């Protein structure tokens, strides 16, 4: 684990990604998260295991390129985003959606 995230593992994971492709991965126990772009795989594994109390068996990460944005005559870049696909051990799961009681 890197020194940067040793104190605050909660800063590693920003939010879960809920897309059509990520939702299909839930059937095979894969969860997709947006993570800090400086986080390494051991940081992500430690954060998921501690925050959600599950056993992680594999992590795939990807750094898509930053996209350009333009507002009027001003151009810039969107924030750097890193995605992590986390595979959990059999029998473990993460509750992403609250139970509806209606």
Swiss-Prot record:
It comes from the Bacteria. Keywords: Ribonucleoprotein, Ribosomal protein, RNA-binding, rRNA-binding. SUPFAM superfamilies: Ribosomal proteins S24e, L23 and L15e (SSF54189). InterPro entries: Nucleotide-bd_a/b_plait_sf (IPR012677), Ribosomal_uL23-like (IPR013025), Ribosomal_uL23/eL15/eS24_sf (IPR012678), Ribosomal_uL23_CS (IPR001014). The keyword RNA-binding applies. One of its GO terms (biological process) is translation. PANTHER family: 60S RIBOSOMAL PROTEIN L23A. This is Large ribosomal subunit protein uL23. The gene is rplW.
């Amino acid at each position: 684990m890197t020194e940067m995230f040793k104190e605050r593992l909660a800063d590693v994971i920003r939010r879960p990604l809920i897309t059509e492709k990520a939702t299909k991965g839930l059937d095979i126990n894969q969860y997709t998260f947006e993570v800090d772009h400086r986080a390494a795989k051991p940081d992500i594994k430690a954060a998921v295991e501690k925050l959600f109390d599950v056993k992680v068996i594999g992590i795939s990460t990807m750094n898509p390129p930053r996209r350009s944005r333009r507002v009027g005559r001003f151009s810039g870049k969107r924030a750097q985003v890193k995605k992590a696909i986390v595979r959990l051990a059999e029998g473990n799961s993460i509750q992403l959606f609250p139970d509806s009681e209606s």
